[in-house]
């Protein structure tokens, strides 16, 4: 697949990337796409998946857990441990 077609993936929002990825999955599952086109859209799907994962990692890094003291007063924030 052309580099410029994959490069535009880097500018997509999470919502747009996931929407396009879902569309690609449906097309591939349908089984009516010629082999060459299947390979090309699969490659784009991989790029979209990586973009979504990247955006999710960035969002997780921005989420913080609010910490409180014994009386319930907010004392600050710390990174949220989601594992």
Swiss-Prot record:
UniProt source species: Nitrobacter hamburgensis (strain DSM 10229 / NCIMB 13809 / X14)
Pfam families per UniProt: Exonuc_VII_S (PF02609)
Family indicated by similarity: Belongs to the XseB family.
Quaternary structure and partners: Heterooligomer composed of large and small subunits.
Reactions the enzyme catalyzes: Exonucleolytic cleavage in either 5'- to 3'- or 3'- to 5'-direction to yield nucleoside 5'-phosphates
Protein's job: Bidirectionally degrades single-stranded DNA into large acid-insoluble oligonucleotides, which are then degraded further into small acid-soluble oligonucleotides.
Gene Ontology BP annotations: DNA catabolic process
Cell location: Cytoplasm
Domain of life: Bacteria
Keywords: Cytoplasm, Exonuclease, Hydrolase, Nuclease
Name of the protein in its database record: Exodeoxyribonuclease 7 small subunit
Keyword Hydrolase: yes
């Amino acid at each position: 697949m052309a580099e410029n077609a994959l490069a535009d993936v880097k500018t997509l929002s999470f919502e747009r990337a996931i929407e396009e990825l879902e569309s690609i999955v449906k097309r591939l599952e349908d089984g009516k796409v010629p082999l060459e086109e299947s390979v090309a859209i699969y490659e784009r799907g991989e790029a979209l998946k990586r973009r979504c994962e990247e955006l999710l990692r960035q969002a997780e890094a921005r989420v913080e857990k609010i910490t409180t003291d014994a009386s319930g007063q907010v004392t600050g924030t710390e990174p949220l441990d989601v594992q």
